[in-house]
Regions:
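Short linker/helix segments within small regulatory modules
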Residues: 386-400
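Activation segment/activation loop of eukaryotic-type protein kinase catalytic domains
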Residues: 189-218
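Catalytic-loop of the protein kinase fold
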Residues: 170, 174-191
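Regulatory extensions appended to serine/threonine kinase catalytic cores
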Residues: 342-374
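ATP-binding glycine-rich phosphate-binding loop
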Residues: 32-74
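ATP-binding glycine-rich loop module of kinase domains
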Residues: 57, 64-107, 111, 147-152
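Conserved C-lobe activation region of Hanks-type protein kinase-like domains
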Residues: 248-299
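Conserved structural core of kinase catalytic domains
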Residues: 111-158
Length: 423
């Protein structure tokens, strides 16, 4: 058996049987502190559960739960040590990590905990995990300039391959009985070839141990209360993944952003009010996408992918009887999208591989007449039909300008000619 991921196909001979059972009732967590309250600098020695010496290297990062260090240990692969802050060394965390280390998931798409770390008196202080290389998704994928600086050769084909790997990796973890819970762009590292690795796996939801953290933008609208008080379902991951895929495909545009509605995106998300049409859904009156290049990406996506993402973003599970589309189906839609962009496919045209667009998707008969150009105002690559060039010159825009920048200039000129006077 095989899974779509990381170069499209990864063998999952050990991933066919779920490692963890999905539960419906959160366990009562033992909040007793079990550590010694000490802090550990570079050079200190800790011990694994089997008694192996682990020497702390340089600090890599620090967060709300703890600090991450490089480590020196007798291991075939490089490892990092995550040491929890003294107030985070609870008994339930040690118990959860013991469960996770006893049933390790060996997959390149997740940095799964390997061994628990103790001090010389065998008091719990942290966990040992594989070191993952790459760039955090949120550090480059949500702005065209950052993306081209990080990966200069990437096109929409590479961006779609990245989305495929994101979907397939979540599907793989779901098959193992794991719910990610806190699924957001800071928890996934991306390599130049588009392969990905989820980090901070110690916060994943396994069995009846909840994921006690979350990110509001990726929180399913039907969820209420504190994150640690309930168990999440795979459907909640599907919602967060759909938000992440939309933002990645549009280079940072929130799915619920709209013209004139900057302050109420969370309310729109709660109601499932998307400003983009799909299938039989039409946006509410007055809901228009923001006037940015990312808005047009939606019209270039294949219909099945649009329908799946749109359904996941607009349905609220308490009032919609249709379940959300799962990551495995999203991965299949994205794989077909990739194949369509390859030579001989239905989307085998350079325009489909542009990162951003200044117009809705044109009919195929018009594509062959369009020539590439670079906007002198915003810098995006856009394409012009012969009629577009003539119209731009008639409007006295001698420089190459995309349609969005022509509209902005026209609006600015209009405002200059008709200034508003306050009496």
């Amino acid at each position: 058996a095989s899974s779509i991921c990381d170069g499209f196909i990864i063998r999952r001979h050990v991933l066919m049987t779920p490692f963890y059972a999905l539960r419906h009732q959160v366990r009562r967590l033992d909040e007793e502190l079990c550590g010694n309250g000490g802090k550990y600098p570079t050079g200190d020695v800790l011990f694994s559960g089997e008694g192996k010496r682990i020497v702390l290297g340089k600090p890599i990062a620090e967060g709300g739960e703890g600090s991450v260090f490089t480590s020196h240990a007798a291991s075939a692969s490089p490892l990092v040590a995550k040491l929890y802050h003294p107030n985070q060394r609870m008994r339930w965390r040690e118990q959860k990590l013991r469960l996770m280390c006893s049933r390790p998931i060996r997959s390149p798409c997740v940095a799964w905990p390997r061994e628990i770390l103790y001090d010389e008196l065998r008091r719990f202080v942290g966990v040992l995990m594989p070191r993952a290389d790459g760039v955090p998704l949120g550090a480059f994928a949500f702005h065209a300039e950052l993306l081209t600086n990080q990966f200069p050769s990437w096109t929409r084909y590479d961006l779609t391959r990245l989305c495929l790997n994101l979907s397939a990796s979540v599907h793989t973890l779901h098959r193992c009985g794991v719910v990610l819970g806190d699924l957001h762009p800071g928890n996934v590292l991306v390599s130049p070839d588009g392969s990905i690795c989820w980090v901070d796996a110690d916060s994943f939801q396994v069995e009846d141990y909840p994921c006690s953290v979350g990110t509001e933008r990726f929180r399913a609208p039907e969820l209420r209360g504190n994150y640690g008080d309930f168990l999440r379902a795979r459907s909640h991951d599907a919602y967060a993944l759909s938000v992440l895929l939309f933002m990645t495909l549009t280079l940072g545009l929130s799915p619920f952003a709209r013209q004139g509605g900057e302050g109420d995106m969370r309310e729109a998300a709660r109601k499932g009010a998307l400003p983009y049409p799909f299938a039989s859904y039409r946006p509410p009156a007055g809901f228009y996408p923001p006037d940015t290049p990312g808005r047009y990406v939606w019209s270039y996506l294949p219909r099945k992918l649009r329908d799946a993402l749109g359904h996941n973003l607009t349905c609220v599970q308490r009032r919609d009887l249709r379940p959300r589309v799962m990551p495995g189906y999203l991965a299949r839609c994205l794989l077909q999208y990739l194949r369509d962009m390859e030579p001989g496919g239905g989307r085998d045209h350079p325009m489909y591989r542009d990162l951003l667009h200044d117009r809705p998707c044109p009919p195929h008969s018009l594509l062959v007449q369009m020539t590439p150009n670079v906007c002198t105002d915003c810098g995006i690559l856009f394409r012009e039909a012969p009629d577009d060039v003539a119209r731009r010159l008639r409007q006295s825009h001698a420089k190459s300008l995309c349609k969005l920048c022509i509209r902005r200039r026209s609006a600015l000129n209009q405002a200059t000619r008709n200034p508003t006077t306050n009496h």
